[in-house]
Swiss-Prot record:
It comes from Haloarcula marismortui (strain ATCC 43049 / DSM 3752 / JCM 8966 / VKM B-1809). InterPro entries: Enolase-like_C_sf (IPR036849), Enolase-like_N (IPR029017), Me_Asp_am_lyase (IPR006395), MeAsp_NH4-lyase_C (IPR022662), MeAsp_NH4-lyase_N (IPR022665). Mg(2+) binds at residues 239, 276, 310. This is Methylaspartate ammonia-lyase. Pathway: Amino-acid degradation; L-glutamate degradation via mesaconate pathway; acetate and pyruvate from L-glutamate: step 2/4. Homodimer. Belongs to the methylaspartate ammonia-lyase family.
Amino acid sequence: MRIEDVRTVPGLSGFFFDDQQAIKDGATQTGFAYDGQPVTDGFDRIREAGEALIVEIELADGSIATGDCAAVQYSGAGGRDPLFRAEKYRPVVEGAVADALRGQDATQFGANATMLEEMSPQRSGGDQLHTAVRYGVSQALLNAAAQARGVTPTDVLADTYDTEPATSPVPVFGQSGDERRINAEKMLIKGVPVLPHGLFNSVEKVGENGEGLRDYLAWLSDRATALGPEPYSPRFHVDVYGILGKVFGPPYDRTEVTDYFETLREAAAPYPLQVEGPMDAGGRQAQITEMAELREGLADAGVDVDIVADEWCNTFEDVQAFVDAEAADLVQIKTPDLGGIQRSAEAVLYCDGTDTRAYVGGTCNETVTSARACAHVALATDAAQVLAKPGMGFDEGFMVVTNEMRRALARRDATQEVPADD
């Protein structure tokens, strides 16, 4: 089945683009917007409406495969590609990318995705095409291969990487945003496997001595017991955005720090706990050093809390560096930051055989189409967990990702059933 054409149309993403540096520099939030001037290149305001570029690949039989070019909320920060503007990159996809893909065999996802990954970067100003372009077009290529072959995208990825896909839904990870109590209770009622994120992104929220986070975990444990279905064994996952580093500071293997993590474990009990982004060391190598120091300190003290890499773990090479250094129990695979969707699968698989698990993450600023593609990455690689996305409302993203996995598993089960002899 040949690719006939590639078309695009500008669309919307599930959240907003935020100028992270301006916010860190003290921009004042007024209602939902921020006062002040942006400081990151490409921004006209500190908070702007999210954009996506909808990609359609037309196959020889007239069928259409779709993907969405999307970028993270904090675009342009931390060495990421520039702020993604759909209209700016539309000619890139409909021009050089489309020219390269027309006539290609749609069933050959691996070859097509590799060609896209290696395309000339002249319009993006970096070493490759903009990550959002590679992300969206590769989703369409994945769907095109699945349609041409009459299988699920999970099967395409499993065949490409010779994996045994998960046979049940990968645990979905819900994020609460600032509505950390109301949304957590929603998650508990629905039996979400991993929750609640919590958005602990300031000392005010965490507490000057960390008491705010500890009290929240104790509340969450009580509510999980009261509201969760039977049986229910969730895993607690909170993101502290480096704030514990501000509260305690290095070295992170000292008794004061490990004792505090033990109080977090006790507050969360009987549910297991993982803490994302405990500190922000300002650079990848420094972050790896401090994360490893904390992880070793917790192990030596017998504190059973998992540490999750987030800050300075954006690209495939970053994931490799954290895993090789044994600096985390779990790494987030930030799908839009890796470019082609196949790179996310490769990043998860890099963790196989190591002491580090991987979760298929991403951003609230994605789309339904990209979230569904990531659900197949999680299934094909049997990831530790997968983010509920897009948006910050929780319910919608949880529905999208959960239903996509259930559909894929049901279809795979049906096609693998052997009919009985007459």
